[in-house]
């Protein structure tokens, strides 16, 4: 029997139907709250000529997908929380709430569609077709976007499916992800097969949950609705990553005016920039008798992360991080949507300041004008609708990805400084903080259990270790050390935005253009700065997500820069003169003899920069491929495990087990929780593993041989079963404490298996 698939044949399509309904609802909600996406594009784009290059669907579909999955999952969870005590034992726990949720969101989606249809019909009848430039559906443009989506989708599918896949009845998890993936599998099965309400951390039962688990409720729900565990995890991951990369590329096109940026932005996202491969190549070439062929072969065949900066050997900056942390892509996508929604207000401030003469009038406009704080009257952008959508996103976001929510607030704070409609930003911040506090209290017992903001300088830079509480004056003295670290770790992703900031700022000032693009780089850097000055969780290394968010946002500008280098926005003098057209301010024209070599030289520079930006990423894809080879680079979970099968059939969905300190084990496919699993996961999530380990070791002794005390404590913690396994003898934390004779003599044996595992009932 395959665990959790007892009713697959009857309801596997329910999972697909749920996703379709979620996406349908999300797209209709976005359409309803943002009535004119072309107008939103106008508020974001560098110029009007960019609009025909960008289809409306490139925002509507990915934003609708992410918003739909976010909100339907959020509502389904709380429906399940309320309903689960009343669900009959022979009915899957999530099925009733899923049916109710699908009915609700189908109705809401249809209602919103009908409202949008009537509104658009009346608008066209009263005002005629929109005067904004529609998408120009020429063959080359359509082919470009379709090809780009296919290429990006192929890359995304490879990243996710290469390290999480099925072979027969076995789930295979690649070597580079299986450890961190262990709690994700356990949480997914906890909802898909078990009943994890009130929700607790599966490797640390009895202490609420402090981990942002909501994405894995979605994957668990997919398993509950019939998808095999692998596809329950992979399918939502693919949808979220594809949507995020689509939004990233779309924003790059709008800000650069170059269509090629749509593909370049995802490429930069997937293949990171760093010094690693260049440093490694120089080391290899310096070896006696080394050749470039040897260097190339060594780099492409290696199966270990190259450790140039601290924790590079864990692959935390590599493509592996997205395979490991499946919820990260969703969080990044939501950050991008929030930027889209507020960027028009940011752009408007600079647009109107450029039309005002005199410092006094500019200061008045910037600080105390009505538009600086309140929405404009009869604004075609419909800012209230955008504000409602942003509020709904941050309301649901805290336990989907807390770090991305903090990153979003940091970016929005930076944008608000230079923006109109600042009270809108404030409203979003208030909703996010209130929602975070309430959810933290509900899930974790208090906000301090989830995040505690304190000053901590230097991230994980070894040279600053031990001096992380140094004052601001001392911290400034380490500026060179921080810059050196960023240069090694980010290379051109750090250098190019700095050059672009000053270069683009000078260009916009010289030609009297809107300054919003170079200034936007400032709020984009706020998560990066935050990562070096603040500690949010017990593990400072977790701040790497803030740095990655900033780097991803920088990629938007870098992609636009490369796209402009690839095809310079310059005209041919003879052609312009022959047409009789006037050149726009800031436009450059060259004689044909100069145009061709200039264009060729620019394209060559672009290709060299692209190589420098992606070389380390390409080498890390090679490592990812070699480390997780399908011949031997995996850990297997057996869906036909007799132990897990017995547990599913003979225990309650919310029963807790005393087990070895398991990390990745077949047992977790049963959806049951353990008292104390591998402690790193729980520790990094903020749980008190030190006290729990003392109590755990005491339990392994049989409460020092006191059966009454043992039963009392087990009853207090909800422990119903004890599993005997030789795995107790594999770690120093358990081998000297485990007393198998106590359990055999005092507890009732309920199951014994050929692999030596025995299950006792407390």
Name each model-derived stretch.
Residues 1-137:
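Membrane-embedded, hydrophobic transmembrane alpha-helices
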Residues 127-131, 135-138, 348-385, 417-427, ...:
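Membrane-interface helix-loop-helix junctions at transmembrane boundaries of multi-pass membrane enzymes
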Residues 141-142, 152-334, 354, 630-634, ...:
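Active-site lumenal/periplasmic loops and adjacent helix-entry segments of GT-C-fold
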Residues 143-152, 264-268, 420-443, 607-612:
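Hydrophobic alpha-helical membrane-interfacial segments at the cytosolic entry of transmembrane helices
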Residues 238-241, 328, 406-412, 539-574:
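Hydrophobic/aromatic-rich transmembrane helices and adjacent perimembrane loops
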Residues 319-324, 370, 375-378, 386-401, ...:
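Membrane-interface alpha helices of multi-pass inner-membrane proteins
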Residues 337-348, 407-417, 490-517, 564:
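Hydrophobic, aromatic-rich transmembrane alpha-helices
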Residues 570-762:
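Extracytoplasmic
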């Amino acid at each position: 029997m395959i665990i959790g698939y007892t009713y697959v044949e009857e309801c596997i399509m329910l999972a697909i139907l749920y996703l379709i309904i979620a996406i349908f609802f999300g797209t209709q909600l976005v359409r309803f709250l943002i009535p004119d996406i072309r107008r939103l594009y106008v508020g974001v784009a560098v110029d009007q000529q960019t609009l025909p290059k960008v289809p409306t669907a490139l925002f509507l579909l990915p934003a609708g997908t992410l918003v739909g999955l976010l909100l339907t999952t959020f509502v389904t969870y709380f429906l399940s929380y309320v309903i689960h005590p009343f669900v009959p034992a022979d009915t899957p726990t999530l099925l009733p709430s899923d049916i109710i949720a699908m009915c609700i969101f189908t109705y809401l989606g249809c209602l919103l569609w009908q409202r949008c249809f009537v509104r658009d019909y009346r608008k066209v009848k009263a005002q005629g077709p929109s005067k904004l430039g529609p998408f120009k559906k020429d063959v080359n443009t359509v082919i470009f976007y379709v090809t780009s989506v296919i290429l990006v989708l192929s890359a995304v599918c490879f990243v996710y499916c290469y390290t999480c896949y099925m072979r027969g009845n076995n789930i295979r998890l690649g070597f580079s992800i299986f450890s961190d993936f262990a709690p994700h599998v356990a949480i997914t099965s906890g909802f898909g097969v078990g009943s994890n309400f009130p929700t607790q951390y599966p490797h640390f039962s009895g202490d609420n949950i402090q981990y942002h688990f909501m994405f894995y409720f979605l994957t668990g729900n997919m398993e509950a609705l019939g998808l095999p565990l692998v596809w329950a995890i992979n399918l939502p991951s693919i949808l979220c990553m594809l949507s995020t990369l689509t939004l990233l590329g779309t924003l790059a096109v709008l800000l650069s005016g170059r269509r090629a940026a749509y593909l370049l932005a995802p490429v930069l996202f997937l293949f990171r920039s760093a010094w690693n491969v260049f440093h490694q190549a120089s080391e290899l070439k310096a070896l006696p008798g080394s050749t470039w062929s040897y260097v190339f072969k060594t780099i492409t065949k290696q199966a270990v992360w190259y450790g140039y900066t601290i924790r590079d050997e864990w692959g935390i900056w590599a493509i592996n991080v997205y395979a490991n942390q499946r919820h990260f892509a969703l969080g990044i996508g939501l950050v991008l949507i929030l930027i889209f929604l507020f960027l028009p207000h940011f752009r408007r401030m600079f647009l109107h300041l450029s039309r005002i003469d005199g410092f006094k009038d500019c200061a008045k406009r910037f600080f105390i004008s009505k538009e600086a704080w309140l929405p404009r009257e009869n604004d075609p952008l419909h800012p209230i609708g955008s504000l409602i959508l942003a509020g709904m996103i941050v309301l649901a976001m805290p336990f989907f990805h807390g770090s991305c929510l903090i990153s979003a607030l940091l970016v929005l704070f930076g944008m608000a400084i230079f923006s109109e409609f600042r009270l809108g930003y404030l409203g979003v911040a208030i909703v996010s903080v209130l929602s975070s506090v309430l959810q933290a209290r509900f899930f974790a017992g208090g906000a301090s259990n989830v995040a505690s903001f304190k000053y901590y300088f230097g991230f994980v830079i070894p040279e600053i270790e031990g001096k992380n509480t140094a004052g601001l004056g001392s911290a400034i003295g380490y500026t060179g050390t921080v810059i050196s670290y960023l240069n090694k770790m980010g290379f051109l992703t750090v250098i190019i935005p700095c050059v672009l900031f000053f270069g683009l700022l000078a260009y916009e000032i010289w030609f009297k253009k809107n300054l919003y693009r170079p200034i936007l780089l400032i709020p984009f850097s706020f998560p990066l700065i935050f990562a070096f000055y603040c500690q949010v969780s017990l593990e400072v290394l977790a701040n790497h997500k803030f740095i990655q968010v900033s780097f991803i946002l920088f990629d938007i500008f870098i992609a636009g820069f490369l796209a402009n280098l690839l095809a310079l926005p310059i005209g041919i003098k003879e052609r312009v003169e022959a047409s009789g057209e006037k050149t726009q301010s800031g436009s450059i024209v060259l004689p044909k003899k100069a145009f061709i070599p200039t264009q060729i030289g620019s394209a060559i520079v672009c290709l060299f920069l692209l190589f420098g930006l992606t070389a380390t990423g390409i080498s890390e894809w090679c490592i990812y491929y070699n480390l997780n080879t399908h011949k031997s680079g995996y850990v297997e979970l057996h869906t036909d495990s007799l132990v897990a099968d017995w547990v599913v059939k003979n225990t309650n969905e919310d029963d807790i087990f005393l087990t070895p300190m398991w990390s990745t084990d077949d047992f977790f496919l049963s959806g049951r929780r353990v008292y104390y699993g591998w402690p790193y996961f729980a520790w990094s999530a903020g749980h008190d593993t030190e006290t729990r380990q003392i109590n755990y070791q005491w339990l392994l002794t049989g409460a020092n041989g006191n059966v009454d005390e043992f039963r009392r404590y087990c009853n207090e913690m909800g422990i119903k079963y004890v599993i005997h396994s030789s795995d107790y003898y594999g770690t120093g934390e358990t081998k000297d404490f485990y007393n198998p004779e106590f359990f055999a003599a005092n507890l009732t044996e309920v199951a014994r298996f050929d692999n030596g595992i025995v299950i006792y009932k407390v």
